[in-house]
Amino acid sequence: MASIWVGHRGTVRDYPDFSPSVDAEAIQKAIRGIGTDEKMLISILTERSNAQRQLIVKEYQAAYGKELKDDLKGDLSGHFEHLMVALVTPPAVFDAKQLKKSMKGAGTNEDALIEILTTRTSRQMKDISQAYYTVYKKSLGDDISSETSGDFRKALLTLADGRRDESLKVDEHLAKQDAQILYKAGENRWGTDEDKFTEILCLRSFPQLKLTFDEYRNISQKDIVDSIKGELSGHFEDLLLAIVNCVRNTPAFLAERLHRALKGIGTDEFTLNRIMVSRSEIDLLDIRTEFKKHYGYSLYSAIKSDTSGDYEITLLKICGGDD
């Protein structure tokens, strides 16, 4: 059965002639003793798929009685450590931890919440919610409820539920109907009916929404983006705009996030690590293409000029090449 975490446009694939015991031993040697063989760690962990890394984690635990992630944490530091630990974490657990981190401490990282919840499939969201409960003994919905409010909270909870339709079939009649409902809920009334926007944008399939947005333009003579900007505000507006952008082109949406993470003073390694790791087996090749198309230079060169050391080497290996 194909994994729900693997697509066809990733940069990282299964390693041929894979042996978890050989890799576990090589990693243990790289970590043990004085000094760490970072090159060895990087070459093994970036050249294996996540499913293969999970087998290495199991083998490592069986052979040495330790958690590989704990040994990596004890031996490495900074951004490089965060990235290597991310690589050995199962995808659903990784996303669950990213969501928790987005809501922990003072202030909520709404951008991260929006990015994760708008780009994961319904089946992935179900896995993430389960992982969240397993790790934190609290439901993802409860934490979202206590950290956010209003229409933004309502929409996030709908997405976190993993109830978006995923069929590829489109229904023209429904698209016309939904476009009409959105028009009446926003442009064509005094005040906005936010619930209608949430219901349609958070539950319909992406192909269905694409058609709905076309119908919307026919009815209103406006793009849905302009209507959302004119009718809504705050994080709720940001969330709905993110959904529209993902419906139209998810790799372009994520390329824009990476561009923001790498632009200006300092690097947003939280976002950079998350997108590079979580999309490395799904659509990172497409994200690279969109990045080059929109910004005139490659993602590879952006990483190269903005990061350094083993952290840079690892990111470039995940990136998988220059464009």
From Swiss-Prot:
GO cellular component, one term: cytoplasm
SMART domains: ANX (SM00335)
MF GO annotations: calcium ion binding; calcium-dependent phospholipid binding; calcium-dependent protein binding; phosphatidylserine binding; phospholipase A2 inhibitor activity
PROSITE patterns: ANNEXIN_1 (PS00223), ANNEXIN_2 (PS51897)
Domain of life (superkingdom): Eukaryota
Physiological role: Inhibitor of phospholipase A2, also possesses anti-coagulant properties. Also cleaves the cyclic bond of inositol 1,2-cyclic phosphate to form inositol 1-phosphate.
Protein name in the entry: Annexin A3
